[in-house]
């Protein structure tokens, strides 16, 4: 069994020590491929470099190894650690995500049906208190309690691509030239 509160309490300080914001901690894969997935980002760029991923992975791994040696491992099975950025079609996990990405298309699934529906697709309007608003393709606004949301993620669109500026394109032209030989 996995203690998510304990995992979050262990992982969040490691991310924060690097100046990173934790986006999601998840455990999936079942018995065949148990995986601890950690998504983080730099708050100023909303991105994560490969070096950031490697450094955070080492910090988390070292911390979990030390807890295991002390008999306090929050995960009682062998697992694979995966550290990554949230990606362009990122999950929306924190209230601030719904404000930050207002105006972009999203898919939201609720834990239980609300007004006969469990899934909502449309444009994020934002969040007010603990109520997320999404406008469907007909322009109907749906008010969803943040606590009722099971999963939410951005939908890859041209608008989202344009809004997501890469950290650096340095070296891209050299890669293209190398591939042309």
UniProtKB/Swiss-Prot annotation:
Q: What is its main location?
A: cytoplasm
The record's subcellular locations are: Cytoplasm
Respond yes or no to whether keyword Hydrolase is given for this record: no
Task: Supply the InterPro entries for this chain.
Answer: Ribosome_maturation_RimP, RimP_C, RimP_C_sf, RimP_N, RimP_N_sf
Q: One GO CC annotation, please? A: cytosol
Alphabetically sorted, this entry's keywords are:
Cytoplasm, Ribosome biogenesis
Work out whether the entry's keyword set contains Methyltransferase. Answer: no
GO biological process: one example: translation
- Spell out the PANTHER family in the cross-references: RIBOSOME MATURATION FACTOR RIMP
Q: Which HAMAP family match?
A: RimP (MF_01077)
Q: What family is reported?
A: Belongs to the RimP family.
Function, as annotated, reads: Required for maturation of 30S ribosomal subunits.
Protein's recorded name: Ribosome maturation factor RimP
Gene source species: Sphingopyxis alaskensis (strain DSM 13593 / LMG 18877 / RB2256)
Q: Lineage of the source organism? A: Bacteria, Pseudomonadati, Pseudomonadota, Alphaproteobacteria, Sphingomonadales
């Amino acid at each position: 069994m996995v203690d998510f509160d304990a995992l979050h309490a262990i992982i969040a300080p490691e991310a924060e020590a690097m100046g990173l914001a934790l986006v999601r901690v998840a455990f999936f894969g079942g018995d065949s491929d148990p995986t601890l997935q950690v998504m983080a980002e730099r708050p100023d760029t909303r991105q994560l470099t490969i070096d950031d991923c490697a450094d955070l992975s080492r910090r988390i791994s070292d911390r979990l190894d030390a807890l295991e040696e002390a008999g306090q491992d929050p995960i009682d099975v062998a697992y694979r650690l995966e550290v990554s950025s949230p990606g362009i079609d990122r999950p929306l996990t924190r209230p601030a995500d719904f404000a930050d990405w207002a105006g972009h298309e999203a898919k939201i699934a609720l834990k239980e049906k609300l007004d006969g529906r469990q899934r909502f697709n449309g444009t994020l309007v934002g969040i007010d208190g603990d109520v997320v608003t999404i406008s469907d393709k007909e322009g109907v606004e749906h008010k969803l309690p943040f606590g009722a949301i099971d999963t939410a993620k951005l939908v890859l669109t041209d608008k989202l691509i344009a809004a997501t500026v890469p950290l650096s394109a340095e070296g891209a032209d050299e890669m293209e030239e190398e591939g042309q030989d």
